[in-house]
């Protein structure tokens, strides 16, 4: 079949790869100048297969209210003037029950663990370099009350068989030697040995080249203006400069999936949750992180690439704007300087923001729509990198009419239409 993929971030390019592997004739279009230019550009770099957790959880509403009054809040809410922002928040609050949390957690772990397996197969097949490190994630807690609050998440790790180890402050330095200098600031730690790290943008750029070798065609600077259909099937996708026909269409447009597909009267429950990152050069390897350190107090991740440190996190609900407030930069700089003061050069750091496509239940939208030939692979929130290959393989199998290797029927848009 001729398959048109909308979006050239990690979700779209990964989908193109598996569709081409399945023998389809694949075309990818994107409004940007190249691949991985938006949400995939400078994310935190974590491949967090083990600590895949819904935002919507019991106790989150209370926590969110407290965070709003912190000097460096991990969550920030700014009214964007739309009724939809309120509707989305209400849907998220409805998912903050124990029952919904367990259902959503199971779905997310299922996709993430499958994605881990897809990464294993992919690396064996291609040997691609994307500065991957398989040295786990270290979550640090600065206060005892944070440890107590995390007990529910730790119980879920136990239930799903995700390997972990509780650590005393001094034991954290076994995995991150540079933290030996600051153990007095740590109450305890949690190590997830099966997690990994990697540069999402580098991965997507290299995968783009592999896709081209398989015959996938890419068209950039293509802003979608119209989608023509007959009520049952998509006929053409029109941009400002071209017209694309296909037997099947895959939407992997992240936050913009909702706005682009609104013309089809499809109501995708996706809201743009803004995140920030700093990227700085390593100046002292002994003083830098080895893998990823997740600071529970600030909800900030510090990740090591080969010669760079990526500091990313926070969540801001403020619509589609991507301004770079100095206050957010200060938060990221504070955390990395507090834990790894000798690791990198903040004066040379680049500051970035991106929009995460979040659903109210934190689970992506994967699979069919009411249009026979329109499929979704979007809405991954903060886990688009982690879930990328697993979601893409599921999407390619569904488009191809194959049975998926894991359950996928509860991942489609229909769960919001029941």
From Swiss-Prot:
Q: Which InterPro entries match?
A: DadA, FAD-dep_OxRdtase, FAD/NAD-bd_sf
Positions contributing to FAD binding: 3-17
The answer on whether this UniProt entry bears the keyword Oxidoreductase reads yes
Q: Which UniProt keywords apply?
A: FAD, Flavoprotein, Oxidoreductase
* Reactions catalysed according to its record: a D-alpha-amino acid + A + H2O = a 2-oxocarboxylate + AH2 + NH4(+)
Task: Indicate the family of this protein.
Answer: Belongs to the DadA oxidoreductase family.
The protein's name? D-amino acid dehydrogenase
Gene coding for it = dadA
């Amino acid at each position: 079949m001729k398959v048109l993929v909308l979006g050239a971030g990690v979700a779209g390019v990964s989908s193109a790869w598996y569709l081409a592997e399945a023998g389809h004739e694949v075309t990818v279009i994107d409004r940007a100048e190249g691949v991985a230019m938006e949400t995939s550009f400078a994310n935190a770099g974590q491949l967090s297969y083990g600590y895949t957790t819904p935002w919507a959880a019991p106790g989150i509403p209370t926590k969110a209210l407290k965070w709003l009054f912190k000097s460096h809040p991990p969550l920030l809410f700014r009214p964007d003037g739309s009724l939809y922002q309120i509707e989305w928040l209400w849907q998220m609050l409805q998912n903050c029950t124990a029952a919904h949390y367990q259902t959503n957690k199971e779905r997310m772990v299922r996709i993430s663990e499958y994605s881990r397996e897809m990464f294993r197969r992919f690396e064996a097949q291609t040997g691609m370099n994307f500065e991957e490190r398989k040295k786990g994630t270290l979550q640090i807690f600065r206060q005892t009350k944070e440890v107590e609050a995390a007990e529910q998440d730790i119980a879920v790790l136990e239930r799903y068989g995700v390997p972990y180890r509780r650590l005393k402050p001094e034991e954290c330095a076994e995995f991150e030697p540079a933290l030996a200098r600051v153990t007095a600031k740590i109450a305890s730690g949690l190590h997830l040995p099966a997690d990994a790290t990697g540069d999402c943008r580098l991965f997507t750029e290299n995968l783009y080249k592999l896709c081209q070798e398989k015959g996938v065609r890419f068209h950039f600077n293509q802003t979608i203006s119209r989608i023509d259909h007959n009520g049952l099937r998509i006929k053409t996708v029109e941009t400002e400069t071209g017209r694309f026909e296909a037997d099947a269409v895959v939407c992997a447009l992240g936050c913009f999936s909702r706005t682009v597909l609104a013309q089809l009267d499809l109501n995708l429950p996706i809201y743009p949750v803004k995140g920030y990152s700093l990227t700085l050069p390593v100046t002292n390897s002994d003083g830098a992180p080895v893998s990823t350190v997740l600071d529970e107090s600030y909800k900030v991740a510090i990740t090591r690439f080969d010669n760079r440190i990526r500091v990313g996190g926070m969540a801001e609900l403020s619509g589609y704007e991507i301004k770079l407030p100095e206050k957010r930069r200060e938060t990221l700089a504070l955390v990395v300087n507090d834990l790894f003061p000798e690791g990198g050069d903040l004066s040379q750091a680049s500051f970035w923001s991106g929009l995460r496509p979040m659903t109210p239940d934190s689970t992506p939208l994967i699979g069919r729509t009411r249009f026979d030939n329109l499929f979704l692979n979007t809405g991954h929130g903060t886990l688009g990198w982690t879930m990328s290959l697993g979601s893409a393989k599921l999407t390619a199998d569904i488009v191809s009419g194959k049975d998926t290797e894991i359950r996928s029927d509860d991942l489609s848009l229909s769960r919001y239409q029941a």
